[in-house]
A protein has these predicted regions:
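Non-heme di-metal
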Residues: 1-198
């Protein structure tokens, strides 16, 4: 099902350590709108999709989100490697450091650890695809917020790439809802569960 290519989807080369940025960007690793939740959401939702095209789309995007998880983890790692003790003490990264040193742990910028409660798999294709539209928009907004707080061009380059992919995924999920409606002969899919009521 998966083929692992031993390179990142987009290159990550951060030259300057920055614990403040790491403490913010970790949210896209394990925060409520981050890549871990996105990948698990889509790879789980695919099972209840009634059509192969939709299963394939969720598999493709879910797999891509795993690649984005790897990219965000790489950013956090590169921002925190070789930090001095004073850089850690004088930053918002210090509380994270106490629990995880410089390991990459799935948590939100707020310090709340990743939880499956931040994602949804309903088993109703319309409900799940609508959830996915919202998830992609929330991830895009989070990347926008990171760009507002970041002054590192190496970080911003990668964040802009990830932000663009959220927009593409949003568009694909919109197309998926349209495809679902067409496949159901324009039945009012908002009053039925296509996974159960076909």
């Amino acid at each position: 099902m998966f083929i692992y290519d031993k390179k990142l989807q987009y290159p990550v080369k951060i030259d300057n350590p920055n614990p403040r940025l790491a403490a913010i960007i970790i949210s896209q690793y394990g925060g409520p709108d981050g890549e871990l939740g996105a990948s698990l959401r889509y790879l789980s939702q695919r099972y209840s999709m009634p059509f192969d095209e939709l299963k394939g789309l969720l598999t493709d995007i879910g797999t891509e989100e795993l690649g984005h998880l790897e990219m965000v983890g790489t950013i956090v790692h590169q921002l925190t490697r070789n930090l001095s003790e004073s850089q850690i003490k004088d930053s918002a990264f210090a509380p994270y450091f106490v629990d995880h040193t410089v390991g990459v742990y799935p948590t939100a910028a707020s310090g709340f650890p990743w939880s499956a409660a931040s994602m949804q798999v309903k088993g109703d294709p319309i409900a799940d695809l609508a959830e996915d539209l919202g998830a992609e928009q929330k991830a895009r907004v989070t990347y926008d917020n990171i760009l507002r707080l970041s002054d590192d061009p190496d970080v911003n380059d990668v964040i802009k790439f990830l932000r663009e992919r959220e927009i593409v995924h949003f568009q694909r999920f919109g197309e998926a809802i349209q495809l679902l409606r067409e496949k159901l002969n324009q039945k009012n899919v908002y009053y039925m569960n296509p996974a159960m009521d076909l």
